[in-house]
Each structure stands twice: as C-alpha cells, then as structure tokens.
Amino acid sequence: MAVGPGLCEGESAATALRQAQGGLPHSIGSALRACALPLSVLWPIVAGVNATVTQLTDQLIVSYAKVGGINHLDGKNLPSKTAIAAITIDLLRLLFPGFYDERTIHSSELKVEMVSLMDSVLGRLEDEIYKSLEYATPEGLAKKELRRAAKEMTVDLLGSLPGVRELLKTDVDAAYNGDPAALSQEEIIVAYPFVEAIAVQRVAHELYRRGIALIPRIMTEWAHARTGMDLHPGARIGTHFFVDHCTGTVVGETCLIGNRVKMYHGVTLGAKSTGDVEQLRGHKRHPTIEDGVTIYPGATILGGETVIGTGSTIGGNVFLTTSVPPHSLVVFEGVKMRVLNKRERELLMVDYQI
C-alpha cells in the first residue's frame, strides 16, 4: 500500500507505520487513521490484497519500527539515483559530443543540439541540487534561498565544463601515448572504461568542492558500477592521468595525485584501518602521489602521510604505508619466483581433484 503526499494530515502515514508494533489491522490501520480520507474508502485497497502479500508487507513494516537508521521517512526528498544517472549520461554527451549519441551530429546542427541538451540538464540538475541542499543545507543559507542557490550552483557547474574538457583531453592523450594497443583517440573515448570513470569523477569533483551532498558520490558510484574503477569525487587529480585496464582500482577521498601519473588495474590508494573513524573524518587519510609516478598492478599504498616522490615506480603487489623519496623503485621481494623444467614438474606434481 502506498500513501501519497497530500492524503495525510497531522501525523503522516509514514510516522504511523514506524510506530507499528502489532499485526496487520494495527499497522495498516494506524496508517489509514492518519489519513484525511475515510477508512471506508481506503481500507478496501488493503483488504482486497492477497493475504500472503499483506502478511509479508506487514512483517516488513514492523521491521521499519524495530530497525532504524536505514529508513528515510518524513524527511525531505533525496536526490534521485535514477535521475542523476540520466543526467550523468547527458553530461558525458556534453563533454564528448557525438560519442554518446545514437545518431550522427553534424557541425551545422551542433549548437542547436547542445543548447537543447544544456537546457534539459540545467533544469533537471537544478532540481537534484535543490534536493541536496534541502537534505544538507549549508550554514547561513536560509530555506527561502535554496532554489536560488541551487540554480546558481548548477550554472556554475555547467560553466566549469570547458575546463573539465581541457583536463579530459590530457587524460585521453596520456592513454594514447601510454598504451601501444590504442589505435586512435576515438577508440580510447569509445572503448576505454577509464575515460568514462575519470570524466564522471572530474565533473563530480566540481560538485564535491562546492559542498553539494550526495550527488557527487551517486555519480562516481554509478561510474564505478559501469567501469569497475572506484574514484572518489573528493580526490584531487592532476593532468595527463591514465589508469590502464582500470578494473579494481580504488582512489580514496583525500588522495592528491600529481600530473602525468600512470596506474594499472587493481591499485589501491587507500586509508589505514582504525578503530576511531570519527577522528579521521575531514582529515587527510589517503596518500599523495607526486608527478610522473607509475604504479603497477595490485600495488596498495595507504595513509594520509604517505608520499610517493616524483618520478618513482611502484612495482606490482607492493604494500606501502611509508613515504619513498623521488625517483625510487619499489619492488616486492618477499617471494622468490622459481622456474621448473619438465622433469622437476613431474617430481613435484600432486594429484589434486575436486
């Protein structure tokens, strides 16, 4: 049963559902009694539902009262994940005209297409930013000023797109110059998941640094699900950034990454685990990677005080929690590799079956 806005007066239906303690007549009845419409109108809606469905629903409603913290009832509307996903795709269309469109866009119609798309994104993104500001209102901003602030932030964000495009061009250049398998820059934009991940991160970072809640993280987690690369919107990333293959790579919120940094799949730039998380919020927890660093697959670099010096190379599977000076080569020597000939293999062969 759904009880929509405008039906209830006084105590909302959602509040009544949260207070449910007993069986179906109590929980559903409490919600219905909170509504302005008479029970004679609303009760048949519930009574006519399959008994199994109502029983399962009531069990879930009771859990809403027992298990708090994961409900969002009676609060302001949160930004919509579905809407933000659609907006993000349209932002990619603005950043890479012609690459995310189903039909060819000719130069003669580019302005008409982009004006229409920009207008659509402006209105929809403003609505989502307004929801974000309602959810987490910046200090000193009155409720009556939220719509104006949302519009200004949206215009400001869209005004940053030319600068974001300049950064993305350096990323595409770095990918082309750093991967001999790349046949063209068009192939990189169309086929490399890294480009989508870094494009979304760079736009989300613009929202993040303006203090807009929820939306930046929704955007980058959407890209994470599509590309396998987890770039936090708070990370500050320089020019000519490239992550080859990119699957499983994680870059944390307070990372500082310099220019011309190249990484591979499975790299983690993370924070050290601690028992007192609250003391770490708002502080630098993730490493600094200086200019010209290369980090090979599977490397893990942790800690806010860890600095990887300019021009250093971090080998595969290295685990680092301390800084290294510029132009260092860090390799993992904990396990020796052994190559066996055919006879040695036969002597060591173990019959193993599942």
Give residue spans per PLM region.
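Short Gly/Ser/Thr- and charged-rich N-terminal loops/segments
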Residues: 1, 14-21, 31-33
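Serine residues within intrinsically disordered or low-complexity segments
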Residues: 12, 27-30, 40
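Terminal amphipathic alpha-helical/low-complexity segments used for targeting or macromolecular assembly
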Residues: 42-221, 346-354
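Left-handed beta-helix
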Residues: 227, 232-233, 238-239, 244-253, ...
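Regulatory activation segment
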Residues: 278-280, 284-285
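C-terminal membrane-proximal segments flanking the terminal transmembrane helix
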Residues: 301, 339, 343-352
